[in-house]
């Protein structure tokens, strides 16, 4: 199977097989980024220790911690992250996740748009 299947009524992605893309928090494997989809995308993100504070004007992001531990900075407040933690980040919230061996699932709504990523 290819790393993404796109059909009229469904799509399937193998996140581990998608090439990583640099992002403010580390490396991201982005699924459902095709033209046929505008609802949301799904990203498997490996978080770095030196992640960059940023924000979005349009996107809401949902984070779910899959592996590791670390913390997330949300508008200047630090909150711990561990396996099973979920975070909802609204537009305008300046944020960054920080960790070592920290892996999250990120669901941007609507679909991720690089033009909606701003340094804080």
Identify the residue ranges that each predicted region occupies.
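Glycine- and acidic-residue-biased ligand/ion/polar-headgroup-sensing regions
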Residues: 58-70, 75
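A short, N-terminal "cap"/entry segment at the start of jelly-roll beta-barrel domains
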Residues: 1-40, 120
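Ligand-binding loop in jelly-roll beta-barrel domains
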Residues: 91-117
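Conserved short histidine dyad/triad with adjacent acidic residue
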Residues: 41-57
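A cytosolic small-molecule/anion-sensing beta-strand core signal
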Residues: 43, 66-67, 82-83
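Short acidic-glycine-tyrosine-enriched beta hairpin
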Residues: 76-92
């Amino acid at each position: 199977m290819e790393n993404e299947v796109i059909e009229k009524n469904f799509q399937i992605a193998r996140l581990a097989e998608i090439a990583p893309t640099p992002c403010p928090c580390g490396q991201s494997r982005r699924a459902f980024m095709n033209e046929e989809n505008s609802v949301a995308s799904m990203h498997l993100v490996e978080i770095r220790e030196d992640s960059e504070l940023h924000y979005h004007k349009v996107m809401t992001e949902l984070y779910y911690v899959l592996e590791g531990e670390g913390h997330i900075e949300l508008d200047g407040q630090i909150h711990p992250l561990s396996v099973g933690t979920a975070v909802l980040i609204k537009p305008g919230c300046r944020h960054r996740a920080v960790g070592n061996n920290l892996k999250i699932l990120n669901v941007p709504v609507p679909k991720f748009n690089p033009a909606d990523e701003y340094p804080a």
